[in-house]
Amino acid sequence: MKAMILAAGEGTRVRPLTQRMPKPMIPVLGKPVMEYLVEQLADHGFNQIMVNISHLAESIEGYFGDGRRWGVEIGYSFEGYLDAGSTIAQPVGSAGGIARIQDFGAFFDDTFLVVCGDALIDLDLTAVLRRHWQSGAVASMVVCDVPREKVPSYGVVVS
């Protein structure tokens, strides 16, 4: 199965930490947040992972490489452009990262999962997929309620 990890953001809410490392690389109990995600994806049968990167991209790509260490294949989609031989990061936001999926049409030819690279998820991904398939829906989204006063600290889903 296939998954996409959104890991291109600048992590402005946790500066100054993210001036030196991208948010998915912030260590929790000795390893980067995103490593927990890669392990969880592998445990649930996701063996091909596309990661969109931008801010300090080389840190993520250098650490995770081709994914072999976790028994998965990892590919990268860089958000930015080349200027005189240098790569210039230019993140386009979560929606932009997901929109770029079109650039990898052959990669995303079946059911796939999109997760944020800076979030620890306590969720049975196999059960989520099973429920999605049973529903017959084109797309499913897993979200949680957040108290109104905490909304500014989280992403917002308008339904």
Predicted regions mapped to residue ranges:
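Unchanged
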Residues: M1-S159
